[in-house]
Amino acid sequence: MQRYIQRLEEGHDLSPEEAEDAVGKILSTAQDEEIGRFLLALRAKGEKPEEIAGFVRGMKKAGKTIRPKTSFRLVDTCGTGGDGLNTINISTAAAIVTAAAGVPVAKHGNRAATSMSGSSDVLDALGIKTDLEPEAVRQTIEEIGIGFMFAPVFHPAMKRVAGVRKKLGVRTVFNILGPLTNPAGTKGQVIGVFDKKLCEPIAYALAELGTEHALVVHGDGMDEITNTGETYVAELKDGKVSTYTLTPEALGMLRANPEDIKGGTPKENARDLLCIFKGQKGPKRDIVVMNAAAALYVGGIVGSIRQAIPIAEDAIDSGKVMVKFNQFKTFTSEFYRQKNKESLSGKSMSMRSRTSILSPASGERV
């Protein structure tokens, strides 16, 4: 670690292999002081796409992965968070709309970091179980076309850096790695970032990682495609990165005010999402539709985001989204019940085992 820290403090870039090795050490043997110095030195130098790709490979190597079999390109809708705008859970709602429209989704997420409601928080409030084991998530994706991968389950080693990150009190490379480390190996991604300057580096990092089609977006201060102003997009397609801006009008949508898409607590956001799923129109539905359309585009079923807008709208208005939501809720609840049943059965077996090795006559162990 000391060699890597010195290189960074001198302003030198790490090779992808060095970055991968460094994050492996951070997640296993590095001391807190070394981790802190490394993260601050990297932050001061600035992360290069090749370094980001190396960090992602290292994190995936240290974590748990799944490989669901799907008929269409598997996609994820995930943001870095950290925009501080406290909107409704746009990418989470968009994931369910996307799956209802026929493109399989492996949603990667966590609890709230800076907002009141993270993806896991709102799904829990909706009655969808989020902390399933990897095999259960794989089956969920294959059976109903959507699954949720709770970051602490798939990346348990991240606990090692939680204290250091909190103590540093500044954004580090780990603030951008979450959306890039999808455990299902998604080849299509819509990634929202909290800073416009991150769009291109992350798109180039995704190219290094073999992603087929991705949109890295920053819209009017938020880590989403927005209907409140312009969205800056870095698009990775066919191995090339291009940049452009989107407006709601260009997608045939109405422009909204930031207040129109504000969120609240997980329960409040859950109510908003259910209203959208049931067909209620308005700015909150519009922004979900726009982001779902982007996911359908990277999923490969249409040639542009605009072409996907009516597909996303029809998924809601036809009732397909509510059907998919109910499937998601039922399927994850069943896995959760099985998990608890097996856990209770294991405890019962353990108690019987302890009882069986006692002498019936004396109560002494034999």
From Swiss-Prot:
Q: Which HAMAP family match?
A: TrpD
Region Disordered: list its residue ranges.
342-366
Q: What is one Pfam family matched by this protein?
A: Glycos_transf_3
The positions annotated for binding Mg(2+) 1 are: 91, 224
Q: Identify which cofactors the protein needs according to its UniProt entry.
A: Mg(2+)
Which reaction equations make up its catalytic activity?
Answer: N-(5-phospho-beta-D-ribosyl)anthranilate + diphosphate = 5-phospho-alpha-D-ribose 1-diphosphate + anthranilate
- Residues binding anthranilate 1 are 79, 110
Q: Which organism is it from?
A: Methanosarcina barkeri (strain Fusaro / DSM 804)
Q: Name one GO cellular component term.
A: cytosol
Name of the protein? Anthranilate phosphoribosyltransferase
Which EC number(s) does UniProt give?
2.4.2.18
The enzyme's first-digit EC class, named in words, is transferase
